[in-house]
C-alpha cells in the first residue's frame, strides 16, 4: 500500500500516513480502517493527523526484549475497539524478512548500503510490485484479493503492457 524511507522520526511517519490517506477510501464510523504497529509513539501522533479518530481502530504489538532477544509480546488498544485477536504485525514482519533476504542493503549490520533515499525507494517500489502483482499465495496475489487485477501478472505483463489514455 505505502512505505516511507528514512529515520523513523515524526516527519517520516507523517509521510507514510499521508500516503495511506491519499491511496485509500476515507474510512467512516461504520467502515473503520484498522492499523496495527509496534510501540513507536510516532504512529500514535500521525494517525489522528490524517484520519478521524472515530473512524480508526489502532492497536499495538509491543515486543518484550532482553538483550535484543524477544522474550514475549503484549498487545494494547490505542484508538477505537479493535479485537485483540486482530492486533498483529506478522505481515509486516514477514515482508521485512523478505526484504532482508532479497536485498543486501536491508540486512542488519551490513557493509552493503544504499547511499541515497531515492535508491531505496526505487528498490522498494520494485519489491512492492513483485509482492502485490506477481507472487501468489494459494494462487492469489494481494492485488487479486483487492480486485485490482483478475490474474497473476509477470514482469513481462508489467513492462510490455500497452497503455492507452486521452490527452
Where does each model-flagged region fall?
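Residue-level recognition of single "structural anchor" positions
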Residues: 1-167
Amino acid at each position: 500500500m505505502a512505505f516511507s524511507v528514512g529515520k523513523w522520526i515524526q516527519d517520516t511517519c507523517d509521510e507514510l500516513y499521508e500516503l495511506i490517506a491519499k491511496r485509500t477510501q476515507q474510512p467512516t464510523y461504520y467502515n473503520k480502517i484498522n492499523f496495527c504497529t509496534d510501540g513507536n509513539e510516532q504512529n500514535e501522533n500521525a494517525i489522528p493527523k490524517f484520519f478521524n479518530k472515530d473512524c480508526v481502530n489502532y492497536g499495538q504489538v509491543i515486543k518484550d526484549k532482553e538483550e535484543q532477544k524477544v522474550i514475549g509480546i503484549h498487545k494494547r488498544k490505542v484508538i477505537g475497539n479493535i479485537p485483540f485477536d486482530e492486533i498483529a504485525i506478522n505481515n509486516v514482519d514477514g515482508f521485512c524478512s523478505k526484504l532482508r533476504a532479497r536485498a543486501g542493503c536491508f540486512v542488519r549490520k551490513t557493509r552493503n548500503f544504499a547511499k541515497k533515499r531515492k535508491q531505496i525507494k526505487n528498490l522498494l517500489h520494485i519489491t512492492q510490485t513483485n509482492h502485490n502483482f506477481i507472487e501468489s499465495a494459494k494462487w492469489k496475489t494481494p492485488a487479486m484479493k483487492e480486485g485490482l487485477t483478475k490474474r497473476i501478472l509477470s514482469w513481462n505483463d508489467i513492462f510490455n503492457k500497452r497503455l492507452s489514455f486521452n490527452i
